[in-house]
């Protein structure tokens, strides 16, 4: 399977945990940048109230997402110290059966899930600043 794999997740932040979330997110970004050389983009966004956090990941392929899940296991184990619940998860691009099985472990009732496996058209620029 070729083509980009994009993952978008939105979480609520526990009351009183915004500063911890900011600190831990900064640490996570540094870790990902250092340890995941294939990751094309990794961005975290807060809403204006500081009550929701959205994570946007752009991978060159699904294998990069599989690697991301493996190397970030420690972060995932402690993320809900400051995050309350996941509101949605979105996946764009083809994924392997192994990745689909791994991601299904995180599925929860009531969470909005979007999977769009067919990359119809597009391009990626990596040299534009």
Regions found by a protein language model. Name each.
Residues 73-77:
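A short, acidic, amphipathic alpha-helical segment used as a generic capping/interface helix at domain edges
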Residues 1-53, 60-71, 82-129:
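Short S/T/G/P-rich N-terminal loop/turn motif that feeds into the first structured element of a domain
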């Amino acid at each position: 399977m070729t083509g980009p794999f994009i993952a978008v997740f939105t979480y609520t932040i526990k009351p009183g945990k915004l500063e911890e979330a900011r600190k831990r997110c900064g640490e996570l970004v540094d870790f990902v940048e250092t340890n995941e050389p294939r990751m094309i983009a990794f961005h975290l966004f807060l809403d204006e109230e500081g009550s929701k956090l959205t994570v946007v990941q752009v991978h060159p392929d699904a294998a990069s997402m599989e690697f991301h899940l493996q190397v970030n296991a420690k972060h995932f184990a402690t993320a809900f110290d400051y995050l309350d619940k996941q509101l949605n998860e979105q996946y764009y691009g083809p994924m392997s059966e192994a990745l689909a099985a791994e991601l299904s472990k995180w599925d929860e009732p009531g969470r909005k899930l979007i999977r769009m496996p067919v990359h119809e058209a597009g391009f990626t620029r990596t040299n534009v600043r």
